[in-house]
Amino acid sequence: MKPHITVLMYHAIANAAGESPGADPHYAVSQAGFQANLKSISGAGKRCASVANLLNERADAATSIALTFDDGHASNLGAAECIAAIGGSADFFVNPSVVGTANYLDWPALRDMAASGMSIQSHGQHHRYLDEMSSSEVRQELVASKRAIEDHLGSPVTIFAPPGGRVSPDLAELAQDAGYQAVCSSRVGLWCFGEALWDIPRLALLMSTPQAQFSRWVSQAPVEIFSRRARYALLSSAKRLLGNQGYERLRRGLLRGASS
């Protein structure tokens, strides 16, 4: 029987002052929270692995928790160092158009991360929603980002993560044609290893994700996973109904209300 893998999705790690310049604070996990996450994984007898290593059979699927990071925020360098220190790996999805700009990783940092065993993959050339683009534009995002990362780092780019989790109907076909082997989406659930390579589900860490809930993700508690999938289905319906701009306005309003 194929193992089911918990694939985690991070964005930024807040600094010691609890700040994450240039990142959406809603998705910025505290340093203490991230360290607690790593301890929870180790305590469960699991190891941190990149999706790339799992696909290349350099990690044991049955004993791994996959870690992924979207956007290439500068704080990801510290996260990579923590992961490398415990012998783990992770995938970091970056947009070449912002590499080296304020609050983002630069190419030397990405080279150091790759040398330490991290997997540097594509988040598109720009952080644009694919469902608002033509097929030719999506193809350009896939091809240009892959080429830029490979040219700068000298390592293969085989996995894509669509910005904002928005996908185009033909993404799988376009990604395969561009030389990718898998897509890590924002769909919520567990990954049945070896299946759904063009729609690998992930669980997103938020600033507000409690450690107890994280531990249930690691243990793959059925009720917890079901509730997250139900919430995702509801939010996906809202996105379809409101459109990207309407959904983002609603989301910002809800977040302001929650913090007031």
Q: Predicted segment positions?
A:
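Short active-site-adjacent structural elements
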Residues: 16-18, 168-170, 184, 191-195, ...
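C-terminal domain-boundary segment and adjacent tail
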Residues: 26-60, 85, 150, 176-195, ...
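Short, acidic/turn-prone active-site loops that include or flank metal/cofactor-
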Residues: 94-99, 187-191, 205-206
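Membrane-proximal basic amphipathic "stem/tether" segments
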Residues: 1, 17, 201-260
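Short, acidic/polar
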Residues: 33, 76-77
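Metal-dependent polysaccharide deacetylase catalytic core of the NodB/CE4 family, i.e.
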Residues: 3-17, 23-25, 62-65, 73, ...
